[in-house]
Structure formats: C-alpha cells, structure tokens
C-alpha cells in the first residue's frame, strides 16, 4: 500500500513537472496569428506556415463563441467571445489543409504548409 502511494505521488509529480514546461516550449515556437472577426470571417483566410512545429494564436473578436477546427490536422479549439488561445501543430507534409468555424460552418479558411527552407 505504501509503495503504491509512493508510485502515485511520483507519477503526479512527474506529470506536474512535464506540464509546467509545456507552455515555455510553446512560447519558443514560430508563431502565427488567426483572428475570428466580428463580421464572421477569418483573418487571414489563407495562413501560410513552414512545415514543422508551430503555434497559431487564436483570437475571437466576435460576440459569439467560435471553434477553430481542422479535420485533416485533427485540431479543434473553442473560444468564447473576446477570448484568446492557441494551438500547436506539427506537420511535415507541405500542402493545403482546410479549417473552419464549427459553430458557423460557412466560415472557412486554408492553412498552407510550405516546404521548410
């Protein structure tokens, strides 16, 4: 019983330390901006990024909740009105990847992944 508690405490400490370093690592990534505008559009609608690992900072300027979603990238993030957040994406294959606002499905954009230089 004592060994199990010790193991659980060690696992909890390891998890806490691992998650504490995650925001710092995300801050060091190449960063791009994507804004949900009050008029129901994305800005920009085409976001160009280099292949690899990067961060997209999301900002909701509308008065409604929005959701960044990309099925091929397997990413989604819900933002309330006026909220800012981010997603970290790792993709090595250049190409065009659609994304949309799941709450307003006619609002669409494209992530254009360029080859790494």
Where are the model-predicted features located?
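N-terminal edge beta-strand
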Residues: 28-51
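Asparagine-centered strand-capping/turn motif at beta-strand->loop junctions
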Residues: 58-60
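Sec/Tat signal peptide C-region and signal peptidase I cleavage site
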Residues: 21-26
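Extracellular/periplasmic metallocenter environments
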Residues: 27-33, 63, 79-117
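Bacterial N-terminal signal peptides that target proteins for export
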Residues: 1-11
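Bacterial N-terminal signal peptides
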Residues: 10-19
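Beta-strand-rich interaction surfaces with strong enrichment in secreted/lumenal proteins
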Residues: 44-45, 74-78, 87-88
């Amino acid at each position: 019983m004592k060994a199990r508690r010790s193991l659980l405490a060690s696992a909890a400490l390891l998890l806490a330390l691992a998650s504490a370093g995650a925001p710092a690592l995300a801050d060091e990534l190449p960063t791009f901006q994507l804004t949900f505008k009050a008029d129901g559009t994305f800005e920009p609608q085409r976001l160009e990024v280099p292949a690899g690992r990067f961060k997209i900072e999301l900002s909701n300027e509308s008065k409604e909740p929005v959701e960044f979603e990309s099925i091929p990238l397997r990413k989604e993030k819900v933002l309330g009105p006026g909220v800012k957040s981010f997603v970290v994406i790792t993709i090595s294959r250049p190409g065009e990847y659609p994304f949309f606002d799941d709450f307003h499905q006619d609002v669409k954009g494209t992530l254009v992944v360029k080859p790494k230089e």
